[in-house]
Amino acid sequence: MKVAVLGAGAWGTALAAHLAVRHDTLLWARDAALVAELAVRRENARYLGGVALPPGLRYEADLATALSHAQADDALCVIAAPVAGLRALCRAMRDARRVPAHFVWVCKGFEADTRRLPHQMVAEELPDHASYGVLSGPSFAREVAQGLPVALTVASASAACRERTLAAFHHGAMRIYTGDDVVGVEVGGAVKNVLAIATGIADGLGLGLNARAALVTRGLAEMSRLGVALGGRAETFTGLTGLGDLILTATGDLSRNRSVGLQLAAGRSLDDILAALGHVAEGVRCARAVLSIARERGVDMPITEAVCAVLFDGVAPRDAVSGLLRRDAKAE
């Protein structure tokens, strides 16, 4: 199978490495210097240092060439750009008249200014296309690149897209599940990043494992309430893309969003944290959108409110936790 992966960050590189073991895989990056470096070193030192890339993986800086690689009906395109770059890539595909027959995206979050989920952006930019979906689940790029076991879900309204994605990814140590609840999968992937910041704050303050368990559990309730309000199915949030992704991102030491929370608890400013991080922390990007949508829909999300208060309103992390503890008692 021919597969094109658009985006050579950590996640795009890891997925391309997995795909190249079995398929004719092309990894596209906008930065020609990075493409040249990848071809020579067989390693993405910028985003995934120390991981040797498969000898069969090829690299490309020209987007039209990369898209042409995935045009056939038996091919697949994987968009591994962050949420902020998804719309632009869809426009580029449309303008080049090279929209792949089947494609999936792996970004998580809401578009900051429009509050759109990824599938809404895709539908707006490519209204005549139907065979697309989202691939998501509890996964750290480095572990995937190292060939460690992982389980992901592809959600799409198109059976052809689900089948093509399954055929591409389901091999080696990667297990793929399929479904059609695109909204539920995307909401889970967005909200878990915000909740991971909360868990990082609690852990950074030394509040203990009891507090962590409470935050994860009540955070899952917030995620589910919002997802159902937006049209997702409740059962999706107890699966890989809801509870599974939340547990990993909230507790795993490779989580960028958890790291933001830990550093906020240590007294560092958000600007300094993001500058030092050097990579995307989607929980920071989409926290405002999540809270805004929740308020608009009448969905109670106190943990998300507390995170936004710390990130954007200057509330001290310990004061935000105290505010949560002072909330009125209620039935679970």
Curated annotation (Swiss-Prot):
The lineage of its organism: Bacteria, Pseudomonadati, Pseudomonadota, Betaproteobacteria, Burkholderiales. It catalyses: sn-glycerol 3-phosphate + NAD(+) = dihydroxyacetone phosphate + NADH + H(+); sn-glycerol 3-phosphate + NADP(+) = dihydroxyacetone phosphate + NADPH + H(+). It comes from Burkholderia pseudomallei (strain 1710b). Catalyzes the reduction of the glycolytic intermediate dihydroxyacetone phosphate (DHAP) to sn-glycerol 3-phosphate (G3P), the key precursor for phospholipid synthesis. This is Glycerol-3-phosphate dehydrogenase [NAD(P)+]. Its EC number is 1.1.1.94. The gene is gpsA. Gene3D superfamilies: N-(1-d-carboxylethyl)-l-norvaline Dehydrogenase, domain 2, NAD(P)-binding Rossmann-like Domain. InterPro entries: 6-PGluconate_DH-like_C_sf, 6PGD_dom2, G3P_DH_NAD-dep, G3P_DH_NAD-dep_C, G3P_DH_NAD-dep_N, NAD(P)-bd_dom_sf. It comes from the Bacteria. Its main location: cytoplasm. Disulfide bonds: none annotated. The active site is at 192 (proton acceptor).
